[in-house]
């Protein structure tokens, strides 16, 4: 079996597992990457991310070109046809190769009898492409988002919702964080230029650099030595608002995969940091990040709602709560989020966030700082959440971020800027 032929069927299987089984692409893709040659890994990733980014359009096309959906054991073929559409619409794969390889993918998934059907649908699309795309441009599916999310964005951002959706449908820029314990940002930018690459500093976040062109991490000067970390600019705002100091006791709650834990330690290398996350598997990445950067923190598995279970009676000078959320601010990085989330999830997440906030607030010392952060753009998880918390928590005061009526700072995703992110800085009276 040819590796290239197998590639399309692997992409179809990955997308099927996300859409039909609710699995995260970050869990599904790595084992499939192991099945292809190194030279094909980037294309497999591109096909998976691309199909999930444009799923609404590809589904719309299938409904137009097929009289009945593929179901049961033939369901993977449904997604294989989507992979074919995506290649024809969005990649540089020559059309004849895209057709041939996609049709051959039917053999890999043990549906060789459907090769003719796949070929026919893809060729019909080629013949009718212009007409179909003109019709699609006026359909509800053109936003490439589920309807419930479009409605929420329209309600929350009456004048900005289309800009948010457009940003979500773009490829994200690659942001890095320079480790200030090794280099100044300007110094590392010089090393980057020496390596033949160009980067741009962020105006607000002092360690953030955007690469002109995304690059593999092994090509970045000093990555293995811990000089630089891949982290979106907006995520770097957490440590900026937290402003950790040496010698302080700091809690990083919901810490995995450890990007913010290590940023705290870069800013305050002598801080005593406890990193806690409920997901034991993801905690392994916290250890990996600490090891690569040569840093030490206490790492524990635990549920943020029950601090006594993982820190006893310990109190903290600063707490970073990067709360579990809908992740609607990072859709451009994780397009599977659009299809993994459901409308009902938002109220459940808001309830969980409130429970964690109420549980950890008593662990903050008087005069201490808590930064509440999410990678969401939805008010229920952000401004509304903090407004309600301030109303029920008399010893909490807002600092630097917004006003009591409009608490927090909401970053929206866009262009070369950072992801969608929310921060509220709270001081204990």
UniProtKB/Swiss-Prot annotation:
Coiled coil: none annotated. Belongs to the class I-like SAM-binding methyltransferase superfamily. RsmB/NOP family. GO terms for biological process: regulation of DNA-templated transcription; rRNA base methylation. Its main location: cytoplasm. HAMAP family: 16SrRNA_methyltr_B (MF_01856). This is Ribosomal RNA small subunit methyltransferase B. The gene is rsmB. The keyword S-adenosyl-L-methionine applies. The active site is at residue 375. SUPFAM superfamilies: NusB-like (SSF48013), S-adenosyl-L-methionine-dependent methyltransferases (SSF53335). It comes from the Bacteria. Its EC number is 2.1.1.176. It catalyses: cytidine(967) in 16S rRNA + S-adenosyl-L-methionine = 5-methylcytidine(967) in 16S rRNA + S-adenosyl-L-homocysteine + H(+). Residues 397-419 are annotated as: Disordered. Specifically methylates the cytosine at position 967 (m5C967) of 16S rRNA. It comes from Salmonella agona (strain SL483). InterPro entries: MeTrfase_RsmB-F_NOP2_cat (IPR049560), MeTrfase_RsmB-F_NOP2_dom (IPR001678), NusB-like_sf (IPR035926), NusB_RsmB_TIM44 (IPR006027), RCMT (IPR023267), rRNA_ssu_MeTfrase_B (IPR004573), rRNA_ssu_MeTfrase_B_ent (IPR023541), RsmB-like_ferredoxin (IPR054728). Gene3D superfamilies: Helix hairpin bin (1.10.287.730), NusB-like (1.10.940.10), Sun protein, domain 3 (3.30.70.1170), Vaccinia Virus protein VP39 (3.40.50.150). It is found in: Cytoplasm. Keywords: Cytoplasm, Methyltransferase, RNA-binding, rRNA processing, S-adenosyl-L-methionine, Transferase. GO terms for molecular function: RNA binding; rRNA (cytosine-C5-)-methyltransferase activity. Residues 400-412 have a biased composition (Polar residues). S-adenosyl-L-methionine binds at residues 254-260, 277, 303, 322. Pfam families: Methyltr_RsmB-F, NusB, RsmF-B_ferredox. GO terms for cellular component: cytosol. The lineage of its organism: Bacteria, Pseudomonadati, Pseudomonadota, Gammaproteobacteria, Enterobacterales.
């Amino acid at each position: 079996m040819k590796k290239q032929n197998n590639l399309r069927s692997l992409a179809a299987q990955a997308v099927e597992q996300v859409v039909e089984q609710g699995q995260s692409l970050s869990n599904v893709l790595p084992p499939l990457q192991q099945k292809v040659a190194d030279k094909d890994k980037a294309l497999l990733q591109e096909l998976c991310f691309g199909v999930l980014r444009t799923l609404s359009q590809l589904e719309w096309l299938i409904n137009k070109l097929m009289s009945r959906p593929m179901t049961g054991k033939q369901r993977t073929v449904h997604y294989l046809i989507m992979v074919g559409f995506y290649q024809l619409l969005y990649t540089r794969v020559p059309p004849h190769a895209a057709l041939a390889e996609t049709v051959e993918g039917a053999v890999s998934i043990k549906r060789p009898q459907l090769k003719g059907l796949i070929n026919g649908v893809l060729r019909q699309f080629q013949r009718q492409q212009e007409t179909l795309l003109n019709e699609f441009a006026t359909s509800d599916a053109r936003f490439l988002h589920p309807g419930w999310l479009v409605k929420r964005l329209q309600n929350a951002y009456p004048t900005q919702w289309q800009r948010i959706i457009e940003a979500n449908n773009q490829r994200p820029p690659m942001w890095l964080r320079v480790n200030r314990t090794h280099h100044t940002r300007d110094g590392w930018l010089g090393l980057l230029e020496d390596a033949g690459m160009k980067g741009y500093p962020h105006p607000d976040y002092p360690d953030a650099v955007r690469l002109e062109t995304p690059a593999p991490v092994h090509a970045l000067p000093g990555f293995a030595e811990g000089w630089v970390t891949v982290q979106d600019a907006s995520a770097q705002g957490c440590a900026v608002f937290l402003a950790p100091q040496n010698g302080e006791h700091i809690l990083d709650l919901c810490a995995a995969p450890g990007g913010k834990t290590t940023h705290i330690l870069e800013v305050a290398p002598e801080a005593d940091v406890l990193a806690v996350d409920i997901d034991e598997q993801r905690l392994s990445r916290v250890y990996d990040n600490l090891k690569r950067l040569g840093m030490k923190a206490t790492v524990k598995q635990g549920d943020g709602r029950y601090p006594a279970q993982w820190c006893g009676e310990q109190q903290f000078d600063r707490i970073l709560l990067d709360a579990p959320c809908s992740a609607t601010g990072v859709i451009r990085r994780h397009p599977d989020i659009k299809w993994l989330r459901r409308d009902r999830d938002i109220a459940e997440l808001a309830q969980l966030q409130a429970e964690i906030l109420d549980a950890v607030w008593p662990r903050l010392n008087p005069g201490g700082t808590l930064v509440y952060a999410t990678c969401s753009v939805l008010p229920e998880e952000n401004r509304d959440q903090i407004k309600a918390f301030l109303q029920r928590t008399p010893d909490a005061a807002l600092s630097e971020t917004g006003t009591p009526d409009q608490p927090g700072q909401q970053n929206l995703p866009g262009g070369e800027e950072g992801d969608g992110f929310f921060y509220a800085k709270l001081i204990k009276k």
